């Protein structure tokens, strides 16, 4: 889809569809009023008949209005004045896209710039709008013999006042990069586990480096992990015929001596639970257990497209967790790259076992910050549901930066505590630490486990178990989150 920004009067534009907003009580904004005047009050007459109440997301398509070059006018409800928030604005945008998809027109003009969205300026409104539209165009039909019908719509133009046009252009540019990153994240997450395994992800990293010349990639194999002393990482993979991979992505968009930010992604390409086997019902969704790594891929793609002046490292800890005669047993003790020993009480708490070695590996980059992203605990879904990611960290300023980025990106997280009292739940009589802390506060104790391997830098942990994918039903699939949050965090660091 091509997105353009223009500063012209809406009633003068030749287009297949002109989109205008109407508030409750027949409220017309400046753009809708100008078009109404040009048509001799045709829009007002339709509204007077009561065909559109103006509630958020309601639509009404008008054909062949007089004195317009637009073939159609699509009216969309914007709700009550001064009550339009992010959620309602997204609903409005989705309703517009849904209608446009069903039309024969190849282009549309969106005259929505005069809509007031609470707490959002022209840049933020444009970004939210374009991101919603672009993400709404996503289709995954790679394995369907009956493909989706090609979309006739090819171009969307946003109208903006001349004073706002630069801000709208920038918002649109950022949104397109984020949406492209989300699409990559969703593609990787939606792929079946017989295709998307650790070796495949290594190949995808190299493919991304061919597409964007600023990206450097290293793929560490099983032998290299053994040389590095990553006993915990290797323990997760030893039950599978698929070999593990530690994928290292590096992008240097700033001065060489500037310390990088590091993103660490959990990449369990399929999680059976290992010997601590999961229930069979819903196990197919454990292909999404690599969505942390997929979100690092997607964030890198967004950063590379935007060419941000920042140094960034990605560490993707990729393995498959399977039961077999060679699999790790409950009670096994392994030595991590840090030298700490771990008693593995539950082989289904494997994400932290690959992440802990990746977090130790991150030390060599002397980073400004490290953020790990993982579908780590079902307890996070119990605590926060599927709307909000869990967030913990050892540096309050970093946590606040991530919370702020999530609020701006409408990809929110919520902070959970890492009090010392929780650490006691991880005590082991046989090793330095146990990999689970009992039934209580499971998300927090998982964060506590990781914190023991992140003491040499500012670190935060995002638990995306509830937000990385939609479970069951017709909308089942990866969401692309938290690419918007992470990209916004890096945009702010790049200023």
UniProtKB/Swiss-Prot annotation:
<keyword id="KW-0464">Manganese</keyword>
<feature type="binding site">
    <location>
        <position position="350"/>
    </location>
    <ligand>
        <name>Mn(2+) 2</name>
    </ligand>
</feature>
<comment type="similarity">
    <text>Belongs to the peptidase M17 family.</text>
</comment>
<dbReference type="InterPro" id="IPR008283">
    <property type="entry name" value="Peptidase_M17_N"/>
</dbReference>
<keyword id="KW-0963">Cytoplasm</keyword>
<feature type="binding site">
    <location>
        <position position="289"/>
    </location>
    <ligand>
        <name>Mn(2+) 2</name>
    </ligand>
</feature>
<keyword id="KW-0645">Protease</keyword>
<protein>
    <recommendedName>
        <fullName>Probable cytosol aminopeptidase</fullName>
        <ecNumber>3.4.11.1</ecNumber>
        <ecNumber>3.4.11.10</ecNumber>
    </recommendedName>
</protein>
<feature type="binding site">
    <location>
        <position position="271"/>
    </location>
    <ligand>
        <name>Mn(2+) 2</name>
    </ligand>
</feature>
<keyword id="KW-0378">Hydrolase</keyword>
<feature type="binding site">
    <location>
        <position position="271"/>
    </location>
    <ligand>
        <name>Mn(2+) 1</name>
    </ligand>
</feature>
<dbReference type="InterPro" id="IPR000819">
    <property type="entry name" value="Peptidase_M17_C"/>
</dbReference>
<dbReference type="Pfam" id="PF02789">
    <property type="entry name" value="Peptidase_M17_N"/>
</dbReference>
<dbReference type="Pfam" id="PF00883">
    <property type="entry name" value="Peptidase_M17"/>
</dbReference>
<dbReference type="InterPro" id="IPR023042">
    <property type="entry name" value="Peptidase_M17_leu_NH2_pept"/>
</dbReference>
<feature type="binding site">
    <location>
        <position position="348"/>
    </location>
    <ligand>
        <name>Mn(2+) 1</name>
    </ligand>
</feature>
<keyword id="KW-0031">Aminopeptidase</keyword>
<dbReference type="InterPro" id="IPR011356">
    <property type="entry name" value="Leucine_aapep/pepB"/>
</dbReference>
<dbReference type="GO" id="GO:0006508">
    <property type="term" value="P:proteolysis"/>
</dbReference>
<feature type="binding site">
    <location>
        <position position="350"/>
    </location>
    <ligand>
        <name>Mn(2+) 1</name>
    </ligand>
</feature>
<feature type="active site">
    <location>
        <position position="352"/>
    </location>
</feature>
<feature type="active site">
    <location>
        <position position="278"/>
    </location>
</feature>
<dbReference type="GO" id="GO:0005737">
    <property type="term" value="C:cytoplasm"/>
</dbReference>
<dbReference type="InterPro" id="IPR043472">
    <property type="entry name" value="Macro_dom-like"/>
</dbReference>
<dbReference type="GO" id="GO:0030145">
    <property type="term" value="F:manganese ion binding"/>
</dbReference>
<feature type="binding site">
    <location>
        <position position="266"/>
    </location>
    <ligand>
        <name>Mn(2+) 2</name>
    </ligand>
</feature>
<keyword id="KW-0479">Metal-binding</keyword>
<dbReference type="GO" id="GO:0070006">
    <property type="term" value="F:metalloaminopeptidase activity"/>
</dbReference>
<comment type="function">
    <text>Presumably involved in the processing and regular turnover of intracellular proteins. Catalyzes the removal of unsubstituted N-terminal amino acids from various peptides.</text>
</comment>
């Amino acid at each position: 889809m091509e997105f353009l920004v223009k500063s012209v009067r809406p009633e003068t534009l030749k287009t297949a569809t002109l989109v205008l907003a109407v508030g409750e009580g027949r409220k017309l904004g400046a753009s809708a009023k100008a078009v109404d005047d040009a048509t001799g009050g045709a829009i007002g007459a339709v509204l007077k008949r009561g065909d559109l109440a103006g509630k958020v997301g309601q639509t009404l398509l008008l054909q062949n209005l007089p004195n317009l070059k637009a073939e159609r006018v699509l009216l969309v409800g914007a709700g009550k004045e001064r009550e339009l928030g992010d959620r309602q604005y997204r609903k409005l945008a989705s309703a517009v896209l849904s209608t446009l998809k069903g039309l024969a027109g190849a282009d549309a003009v969106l005259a929505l710039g005069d809509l007031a969205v609470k707490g959002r300026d022209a840049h933020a409104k444009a970004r939210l709008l374009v991101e919603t539209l672009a993400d709404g165009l996503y289709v995954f039909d790679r394995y369907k013999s009956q493909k989706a019908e090609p979309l006739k719509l090819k171009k969307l133009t946003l109208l903006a006042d001349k004073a706002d046009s630069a801000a709208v252009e920038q918002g649109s540019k950022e949104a397109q990069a984020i949406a492209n990153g989300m699409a990559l994240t969703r593609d990787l997450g939606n792929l079946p586990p017989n295709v998307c395994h650790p070796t495949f992800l290594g190949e995808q990293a190299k493919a991304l480096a061919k597409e964007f010349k600023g990206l450097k990639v290293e793929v560490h194999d099983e032998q290299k992990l053994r040389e590095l002393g990553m006993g915990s990482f290797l323990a997760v993979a030893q039950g599978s015929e698929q070999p593990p991979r530690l994928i290292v992505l590096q992008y240097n968009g700033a001065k060489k001596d500037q310390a990088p930010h590091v993103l660490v992604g959990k990449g369990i390409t399929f999680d059976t639970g290992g010997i601590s086997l999961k229930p069979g019902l819903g196990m197919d969704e454990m292909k999404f257990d690599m969505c942390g790594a997929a979100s690092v891929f997607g964030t890198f793609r967004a950063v590379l497209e935007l060419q941000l002046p920042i140094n960034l490292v990605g560490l993707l800890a990729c393995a498959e967790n399977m039961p077999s005669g060679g699999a790790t047993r409950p009670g096994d003790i392994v030595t991590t790259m840090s030298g700490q020993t771990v008693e593995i009480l539950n082989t289904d708490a494997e994400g932290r076992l690959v992440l802990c070695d990746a977090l130790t590996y991150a030390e060599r980059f002397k980073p400004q910050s490290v953020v790990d992203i993982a579908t780590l605990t079902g307890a996070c879904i119990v605590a926060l549901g599927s709307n909000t990611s869990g967030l913990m960290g050892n540096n309050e300023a970093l946590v606040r930066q991530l919370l702020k980025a999530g609020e701006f990106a409408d990809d929110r997280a919520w902070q959970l505590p890492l009090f010392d009292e929780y650490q006691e739940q991880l005590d082991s009589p046989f090793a330095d630490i146990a990999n689970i802390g009992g039934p209580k506060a499971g998300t927090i104790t998982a964060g506590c486990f990781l914190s023991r391997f992140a003491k040499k830098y500012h670190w935060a942990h995002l638990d995306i178990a509830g937000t990385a994918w939609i479970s069951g039903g017709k909308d089942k699939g990866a969401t692309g989150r938290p690419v918007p949050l992470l990209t916004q965090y890096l945009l702010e660091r790049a200023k």
